[in-house]
C-alpha cells in the first residue's frame, strides 16, 4: 500500500510544484484503487507518513522516485475484475419490489434498496414494482408520492409498475376475512396493556377461542364502524421464543383521515399482512431487505403457510451505517416547517435531492451501492468512496479556475503588468484556455506574514513588506521557482482584483463561503461542474445580479 500511496502523492506534489494536496490525492487513490476503499483509515495513516518523506525531497528527487514506482504512469495496472453479485435460486422470470413509505422524498439509505432491486431486475430481465406503502395515514406526506418517483428517475432506477397500498384496501379485507374464516385470525378487544402482559407470559387472551363465525360478526362490525378499540390478530405460536411473534396484529382501526381516501376507510392492514398479500399477488420471486426485518420475515411466513403460497427467496443484508447528514424524515420535515432547513434539498440533509443539488451524480451513487452489495455484515458508508466515484464521473468535464475565499487584497510593487494563459483542463486542450491579467493588485486566500517570501502560482515570487488597514503590501522579488524553493516559500493561488467575480459557495453544512473567482469563470452555466483549484469541485447553481451561487460537491 505504501508504494501506491507514495506514487499518487508524488504525482500530486509534482503537479502542484512541490506542495501536495493530500485530500485530492486521497480521492484519486480511492477512485483508481477500489480495493483500498474499505481501508480509508489505513490509507490516511500512510498518507501522513509518506507526506513527511516527500517534504524532504526536491522536485527532481520526487520525479525520479515517481518514475521508479510507476514507470508506465499511474492507473495503468489492469484492475482485477470484481465478481458481479448474483441472486440465488433464479427460476424463470424475476420479479422484485422497492417499497418505501411516502413520508418524504428518498434519502441515501433508500438508495441501496432501490439500486440493488433495479440492478437485479435489469440483470435478469425481470420486473421491478414500486410499491408505496401508505397504510399509516399519520406518516404520509402527500407530495411524497410524486417526489419518490422523481428521485428514482434521477437515480436511473427503471420502474415497471407502481402500486399504491391505500388503493388496495378491499383486497386486504378479502384475505383478512379468509384468515378469519379458516380460523387463523381473530378479532381481539383486549386492552393493549392487558394483552401485552398475557403475551409476555405466553398465555392466550380470552378472544383467541372465539369461533370463526363469531369473529366474522365482529369483523363486519369493524368494517361498518360499530366497534372501536379492536384489532385483528394472527394466530401463531403463543409460546414462541420471541414474544413479538406471538399473535401479532394484522388489522387495526385508524380514524385519521387518509390523504388519498379521506374518511372512506377506517380499518387498515398492518405491514406484515399487506406486504405478504402484495408480494404473493404481484408474483415477487425475490425480496431484498435489511436484516432488521428477519423477524418480519418469520411473521410473514405464517401467512404464506396458512394460504399454502410459495415463499419468495428472502435476502437479508447488513445495516448501512451512515454518519453525517440528517436522515430522519420526521426530523427533516419538522426542520423544514420551522425554517431550520431551506427545503428537502438543504445541503445538511441526506436526501437524494440534497446530494443532487450538491453535485453528486446518480451514476456514482448507483455504482457505489452495487459495490456495497448484499453482504450480511454491517457496512459503514464511506463518504470518501462516494466522492472518489463522483470525481471519476465529473473530473473530465470540470473546468479549472482559481477561487479566493475570504479574500485579502495584496498590492505589489516593482512588477510589470503581465498576462498568463492557463488551460481550462490539464488533460483536455479542446476546452480552451483562461487568461489572468496581473496589473499590480491581486486577491489571495492565505494569511501572509510580513518579511516572508511567497510564490504566486504560475507567476513570480514576492516578499511581503507590511500589512496596513487589512491591505497587504508586497514587492516583486524574482521569477525563478528555484529561488522560491530555496526560501521554502509557500506557493499560493491568486486572482486579479480587476474583473474578479463574486462567488458564494455553500458547503455541506449549509455555510456560505464568500470569495472571488477569476473573470473567465463567467463562461459557466447552471449545473456545470467546476474545480476551484486547491479548494474543491463545485456545482454551479445560479447566477445572481451580484455574482454566482455554487454548491461544494467535495474536495
From Swiss-Prot:
It is found in: Cytoplasm. One of its GO terms (biological process) is amide biosynthetic process. Belongs to the class-I aminoacyl-tRNA synthetase family. Glutamate--tRNA ligase type 2 subfamily. This is Glutamate--tRNA ligase. The gene is gltX. GO terms for cellular component: cytosol; protein-containing complex. The keyword Signal does not apply. Keywords: Aminoacyl-tRNA synthetase, ATP-binding, Cytoplasm, Ligase, Nucleotide-binding, Protein biosynthesis. It catalyses: tRNA(Glu) + L-glutamate + ATP = L-glutamyl-tRNA(Glu) + AMP + diphosphate. Its main location: cytoplasm. Catalyzes the attachment of glutamate to tRNA(Glu) in a two-step reaction: glutamate is first activated by ATP to form Glu-AMP and then transferred to the acceptor end of tRNA(Glu). GO terms for molecular function: ATP binding; glutamate-tRNA ligase activity. A motif ('HIGH' region) lies at residues 100-110. It holds the Pfam family tRNA-synt_1c_C2. It comes from Methanococcus maripaludis (strain C6 / ATCC BAA-1332).
Amino acid at each position: 500500500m505504501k508504494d501506491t500511496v507514495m506514487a499518487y502523492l508524488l504525482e500530486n506534489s509534482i503537479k502542484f510544484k512541490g506542495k501536495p494536496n493530500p485530500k485530492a490525492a486521497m480521492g484519486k487513490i480511492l477512485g483508481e484503487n477500489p480495493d483500498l476503499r474499505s481501508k480509508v483509515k489505513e490509507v490516511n495513516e500512510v498518507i501522513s507518513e509518506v507526506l513527511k518523506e516527500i517534504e524532504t525531497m526536491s522536485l527532481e528527487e520526487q520525479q525520479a522516485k515517481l518514475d521508479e514506482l510507476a514507470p508506465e504512469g499511474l492507473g495503468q495496472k489492469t484492475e482485477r475484475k470484481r465478481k458481479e453479485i448474483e441472486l440465488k435460486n433464479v427460476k424463470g422470470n424475476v420479479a422484485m419490489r422497492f417499497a418505501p413509505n411516502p413520508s418524504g422524498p428518498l434519502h441515501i439509505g433508500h438508495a441501496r434498496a432501490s439500486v440493488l432491486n433495479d440492478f437485479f431486475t435489469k440483470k435478469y430481465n425481470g420486473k421491478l414494482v414500486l410499491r408505496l406503502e401508505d397504510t399509516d395515514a399519520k406518516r404520509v406526506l402527500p407530495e411524497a408520492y410524486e417526489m419518490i418517483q422523481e428521485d428514482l428517475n434521477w437515480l436511473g432506477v427503471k420502474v415497471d409498475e407502481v402500486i399504491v397500498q391505500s388503493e388496495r384496501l378491499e383486497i386486504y379485507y378479502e384475505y383478512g376475512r379468509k384468515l378469519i374464516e379458516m380460523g387463523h385470525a381473530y378479532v381481539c378487544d383486549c386492552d393493549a396493556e392487558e394483552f401485552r402482559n398475557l403475551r409476555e407470559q405466553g398465555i392466550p387472551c380470552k378472544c383467541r377461542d372465539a369461533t370463526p363465525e363469531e369473529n366474522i360478526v365482529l369483523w363486519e362490525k369493524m368494517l361498518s364502524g360499530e366497534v372501536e378499540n379492536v384489532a385483528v390478530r394472527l394466530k401463531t405460536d403463543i409460546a414462541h421464543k420471541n414474544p413479538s411473534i406471538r399473535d401479532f396484529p394484522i388489522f387495526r382501526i385508524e380514524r385519521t383521515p387518509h390523504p388519498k381516501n379521506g374518511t372512506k376507510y377506517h380499518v387498515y392492514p398492518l405491514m406484515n399482512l399487506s406486504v405478504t398479500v402484495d408480494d404473493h399477488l404481484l408474483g415477487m420471486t425475490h425480496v431484498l431487505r435489511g436484516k432488521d426485518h428477519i423477524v418480519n420475515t418469520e411473521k410473514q411466513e405464517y401467512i404464506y403457510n396458512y394460504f399454502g403460497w410459495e415463499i419468495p427467496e428472502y435476502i437479508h443484508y447488513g445495516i448501512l451505517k451512515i454518519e453525517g447528514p440528517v436522515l430522519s424524515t420526521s426530523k427533516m420535515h419538522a426542520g423544514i416547517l420551522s425554517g431550520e432547513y431551506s427545503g428537502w434539498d438543504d445541503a445538511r440533509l441526506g436526501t437524494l435531492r440534497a446530494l443532487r443539488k450538491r453535485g453528486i451524480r446518480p451514476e456514482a451513487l448507483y455504482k457505489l451501492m452495487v459495490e456495497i452489495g448484499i453482504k450480511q455484515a454491517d457496512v459503514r458508508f464511506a463518504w470518501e468512496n462516494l466522492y472518489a466515484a463522483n470525481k471519476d464521473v465529473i473530473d473530465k468535464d470540470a473546468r479549472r479556475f482559481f477561487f479566493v475565499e475570504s479574500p485579502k487584497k495584496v498590492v505589489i510593487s516593482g512588477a510589470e503588468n503581465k498576462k498568463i494563459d492557463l488551460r481550462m483542463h490539464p488533460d483536455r486542450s479542446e476546452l480552451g484556455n483562461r487568461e489572468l491579467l496581473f496589473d499590480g493588485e491581486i486577491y489571495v486566500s492565505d494569511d501572509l506574514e510580513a518579511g516572508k517570501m511567497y510564490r504566486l502560482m504560475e507567476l513570480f515570487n514576492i516578499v511581503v513588506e507590511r500589512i496596513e488597514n487589512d491591505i497587504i503590501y508586497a514587492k516583486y522579488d524574482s521569477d525563478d521557482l528555484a529561488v522560491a524553493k530555496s526560501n521554502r516559500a509557500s506557493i499560493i493561488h491568486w486572482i486579479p482584483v480587476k474583473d474578479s467575480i463574486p462567488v458564494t459557495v455553500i458547503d455541506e453544512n449549509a455555510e456560505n463561503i464568500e470569495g472571488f473567482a477569476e473573470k473567465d469563470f463567467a463562461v459557466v452555466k447552471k449545473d456545470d461542474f467546476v474545480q476551484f483549484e486547491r479548494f474543491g469541485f463545485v456545482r454551479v447553481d445560479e447566477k445572481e445580479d451580484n455574482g454566482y451561487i455554487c454548491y461544494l460537491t467535495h474536495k
